[in-house]
Amino acid sequence: MSSEKSGLPDSVPHTSPPPYNAPQPPAEPPIPPPQTAPSSHHHHHHHYHQSGTATLPRLGAGGLASAAAGAQRGPSSSATLPRPPHHAPPGPAAGAPPPGCATLPRMPPDPYLQETRFEGPLPPPPPAAAAPPPPAPAPTAQAPGFVVPTHAGAVGTLPLGGYVAPGYPLQLQPCTAYVPVYPVGTPYASGTPGGPGVTSTLPPPPQGPGLALLEPRRPPHDYMPIAVLTTICCFWPTGIIAIFKAVQVRTALARGDLVSAEIASREARNFSFISLAVGIAAMVLCTILTVVIIIAAQHHENYWDP
């Protein structure tokens, strides 16, 4: 009892104030004793239970000096508390405190670094970021395909996959379709060589909106008959000019000049119509004058009668 109550030797004078009136600095944690290796049948539990005692420094009049002195003197000058058994071995361990002492459970140095061994397979790793799909392998051999005839003398290979194999480009040419045109009533003979031919008459094929048959250009009209008629019956000055233009139309057609023939044809038509109009107007005017003269003559005769 005397060793537990004494904090410092009697020779050291007490210079500190009462221990319960002034705050004391935090005491340094005691150095944990070396831990023993756990047995093989206890590998599922934490490795912090060991035999030994927890030494608590007594806060007496000496403060930290009494704690250091108590740590040097060992169990005789420190308060030891019994530790509750936690998977303790069946027999008393070496250095265990006496049964009458109270021990506190010792915590590991770092509670976040506890070594715990788990049985079973490891958890799967987190899924990695979605990687782009690997590029398709380049074809090394020509894929089987079929031959598409596109033009006379040039063919192209179109594979089944829809792409053209390297070295064999697909040669496409614009479509040149020739539609046969048969005139109405034109018979044609059909049959095998050496056999009798069958003569039949087919109607002309219908013309679609995008199909136009090239017809030969019609030559322009010379208007010679109307020019002669207007010259004789209507107005001869313009009639003679119309006849002259009609002759120019025939001359241009004879040498193959369609442009000059078109121009001369228009002029011959215009002068012929002018001759016709002047002739009609002259006949109307002559008729009116004739009627006026006849009426005037009758009035004059009636005036001079007795």
Curated annotation (Swiss-Prot):
Gene Ontology molecular function, alphabetical: signaling receptor regulator activity
Region listing for Disordered, in residue ranges: 1-144
Stretches within the membrane that do not traverse it: 276-296
Compartments in which it is found: Cell membrane; Synapse
Record field: compositional bias (Basic residues): 40-49
Membrane-spanning segments: 224-244
Reported tissue expression: Expressed in the brain (at protein level). In brain, expressed in the neocortex and enriched in the hippocampus but only modestly expressed in the cerebellum. Expressed throughout the hippocampus but is most highly expressed in the CA1 region and the stratum lacunosum-moleculare of the CA2 region.
UniProt entry keywords in alphabetical sequence: Cell membrane, Membrane, Signal-anchor, Synapse, Transmembrane, Transmembrane helix
Biased composition range(s): Low complexity: 64-79
One of the protein's GO biological processes: regulation of AMPA receptor activity
Extracellular side: 245-275, 297-306
Gene Ontology cellular component list: glutamatergic synapse; membrane; postsynaptic density membrane; postsynaptic membrane; synaptic vesicle membrane
Topology of the protein relative to the lipid bilayer: Single-pass type II membrane protein
Biased segments, Pro residues type: 15-36, 87-111, 121-138
A Pfam family this chain is assigned to: CD225
Topological region Cytoplasmic: 1-223
Subunit structure: Component of the outer core of AMPAR complex. AMPAR complex consists of an inner core made of 4 pore-forming GluA/GRIA proteins (GRIA1, GRIA2, GRIA3 and GRIA4) and 4 major auxiliary subunits arranged in a twofold symmetry. One of the two pairs of distinct binding sites is occupied either by CNIH2, CNIH3 or CACNG2, CACNG3. The other harbors CACNG2, CACNG3, CACNG4, CACNG8 or GSG1L. This inner core of AMPAR complex is complemented by outer core constituents binding directly to the GluA/GRIA proteins at sites distinct from the interaction sites of the inner core constituents.
Family label: Belongs to the CD225/Dispanin family.
Role description: Required to maintain a pool of extrasynaptic AMPA-regulated glutamate receptors (AMPAR) which is necessary for synapse development and function. Regulates basal AMPAR function and synaptic transmission during development but is dispensable at mature hippocampal synapses. Plays a role in regulating basal phosphorylation levels of glutamate receptor GRIA1 and promotes GRIA1 and GRIA2 cell surface expression.
Protein name: Proline-rich transmembrane protein 1
